[in-house]
């Protein structure tokens, strides 16, 4: 049996990254993984199909990789959300694709590769399934000291703007035992930080155990000796319970960090979005969380330009962002996705107005972030070392998710290792980043 050199490009979210790592895990034993597409016999593109810009990026990337078939590359494989959604269209649009897989067809990828080289017939396996959850050995594509871990797949929320339930299926939790076993394997590989992801992590276990079990999962994960940080992403605010707040408050290994994607704050917009929350519920929960959890860092994401968004609704959102002062905030223009209820709504907002509103929110948040960072001067944080440049080491504290929340640049006289924890005293601030110097826990 031939041993092939395989390159992979992963696009989209961290959940897609996990799928890419599982793909590499399934292929690593009988093939060699390479980073340079010039050296690859097989190139895999794991696509994203969430919004228009991500769809275009996926198509452009496949076309770019297809050029390597003029040189050493013998096969192009496309997989992921875009192929799950548009398999027939992609086969016609990009004939260079040899194998196309959806989001549930990774287990047999080696067999598909062997079959193609034996029979030279294109393969398309994009059958929809909302039963299985991809699990198995992973080849990490993150830094070796941190890893994302998927605790659930799919979504039941049916937000009017979102296509994910049609791509990923109904919400289904992994078992606690399965997650703990994977976390132990990751810890044995040197992982210090676990980042829990799912479409809605707050309702973890509600399908499998008939009750939310995120708090229990956090307790059991914190018993793994070599794991030092546990971080939760994608917790819908209406599902955050008092029990979860208490667990975050009292568990030293759980980062005092919550990512609560509110999407909007106007009740009329939330209703059109088919969101289950309200302005009053969101506001009350934020106040409760900040009161109970000392030093809590809050991130959110919002959508501007949703169909029918009036000036009054947008002004309500602006005022809320100014008042609540999220530590971190991502803002996105509404993307009109076919096969969604929102795409059929009247009063679609123009692209120019979406751009204007996005810029307005970002300007407000830049001012908020700058003021929040200035309040961190002279404070001491536990920092995870991520790397270094010519002048500084680079790291993150509990308030920072990799690649999206900024970083801490700091000096140290001794040599530090990536994945090591140190204490850093903040000496200067930037808009989103911090500057500091290594110290002891007391700040000396």
Curated annotation (Swiss-Prot):
GO molecular function terms attached to this record: 4 iron, 4 sulfur cluster binding; aspartic acid methylthiotransferase activity; metal ion binding; protein methylthiotransferase activity
Gene Ontology terms: cellular component: cytosol
Recorded catalytic activity of this chain's protein: L-aspartate(89)-[ribosomal protein uS12]-hydrogen + (sulfur carrier)-SH + AH2 + 2 S-adenosyl-L-methionine = 3-methylsulfanyl-L-aspartate(89)-[ribosomal protein uS12]-hydrogen + (sulfur carrier)-H + 5'-deoxyadenosine + L-methionine + A + S-adenosyl-L-homocysteine + 2 H(+)
Protein's UniProt name: Ribosomal protein uS12 methylthiotransferase RimO
Gene: rimO
Binding residues annotated for [4Fe-4S] cluster 1, in chain numbering: 13, 48, 81
EC number: 2.8.4.4
Origin species: Clostridium novyi (strain NT)
Details of cofactor binding: Binds 2 [4Fe-4S] clusters. One cluster is coordinated with 3 cysteines and an exchangeable S-adenosyl-L-methionine.
Statement: the UniProt record of this protein carries the keyword Lyase: no
